Amino acid sequence: MSDSPIKYRLIKKEKHTGARLGEIITPHGTFPTPMFMPVGTQATVKTQSPEELKEMGSGIILSNTYHLWLRPGDELIARAGGLHKFMNWDQPILTDSGGFQVYSLADSRNITEEGVTFKNHLNGSKMFLSPEKAISIQNNLGSDIMMSFDECPQFYQPYDYVKKSIERTSRWAERGLKAHRRPHDQGLFGIVQGAGFEDLRRQSAHDLVSMDFSGYSIGGLAVGETHEEMNAVLDFTTQLLPENKPRYLMGVGAPDSLIDGVIRGVDMFDCVLPTRIARNGTCMTSQGRLVVKNAQFAEDFTPLDPECDCYTCNNYTRAYLRHLLKADETFGIRLTSYHNLYFLLNLMKQVRQAIMDDNLLEFRKYFVEKYGYNKSGRNF
């Protein structure tokens, strides 16, 4: 895929780490990296409009193949003119393969060489997803960046199981490449798996790099391992990937994990974290996490985060946000979601500047001293 519609341009390497400043060029525009991608599971980033996403600096969003396949259906979206037109988003879109959702949401899974049979979590009907079908759905969706269909072994599964799993994922990746109908306007990434085993990650990366994908995803992390274990896997995995292609760490959204991923050479991240926790009143601030629903904020007439200049922090107080959330008002969720997304997008903007200034390690130290550091590795 050397004539891929997805191009990575390296602008600068940070002197003291593996971090890199760059940009990714797609058919729907160019975005700077490192970048956090908000997740629009059902073709919408929950409670946020496309205009708000652009306002907060989101250069690309992610949508979920599994959910859109089940509802409203990829063929309907194709008839609407593709996902960009359907959801009125004219900037880049990345879609996952549906694999992770099949393994985490669906019941009664049965994995064979052909693909995965499972029960639809909405109505219980029996369904089948193969590498070819995953590509076909994404071709219908028309995303700029698509993912290969992979198996997602858990981090602590036995070596022999993980070895068989990555070998199958490599065969599935090859099948997906052959099934890809739109290589001229949709890039396709391979997904490196291998749990915590360095030799299996090496084997997986070697297989996929030989297939010349548009970019490479690092899967199977942020699934229960410690922060230290995730960093160790990233330390050796990013070294196995080509410098002229994008690197995407899947499902990671905790601020300290984003910075640590960038330090190890990752360009792209996604996670439902900012909008999911916002719905419960949990907000990311420069001083750490804050649960604005708590009683202590009932008469706190200060901004959510005095150091933040987002729409929420410029206009509303903690007391008002608490009132909205306690009253189950949707506007409260809109405001906390906006803030959390802005916080992560602004963090990545600061990280990009720190790479430019060659002081990313100092920035990390300063950030973690105020925000805190999550050793467990849980996305929070």
Curated annotation (Swiss-Prot):
Its EC number is 2.4.2.29. GO terms for biological process: queuosine biosynthetic process; tRNA wobble guanine modification; tRNA-guanine transglycosylation. Coiled coil: none annotated. Pfam families: TGT. This is Queuine tRNA-ribosyltransferase. Zn(2+) binds at residues 308, 310, 313, 339. Belongs to the queuine tRNA-ribosyltransferase family. Its cofactor is Zn(2+). Homodimer. Within each dimer, one monomer is responsible for RNA recognition and catalysis, while the other monomer binds to the replacement base PreQ1. Pathway: tRNA modification; tRNA-queuosine biosynthesis. Substrate binds at residues 96-100, 150, 193, 220. InterPro entries: ArchSynthase1/Queuine_TRR, TGT, TGT-like_sf, tRNA_ribo_trans-like. Catalyzes the base-exchange of a guanine (G) residue with the queuine precursor 7-aminomethyl-7-deazaguanine (PreQ1) at position 34 (anticodon wobble position) in tRNAs with GU(N) anticodons (tRNA-Asp, -Asn, -His and -Tyr). Catalysis occurs through a double-displacement mechanism. The nucleophile active site attacks the C1' of nucleotide 34 to detach the guanine base from the RNA, forming a covalent enzyme-RNA intermediate. The proton acceptor active site deprotonates the incoming PreQ1, allowing a nucleophilic attack on the C1' of the ribose to form the product. GO terms for molecular function: metal ion binding; tRNA-guanosine(34) queuine transglycosylase activity. PANTHER family: QUEUINE TRNA-RIBOSYLTRANSFERASE. It comes from Streptococcus pneumoniae (strain 70585). GO terms for cellular component: cytosol.
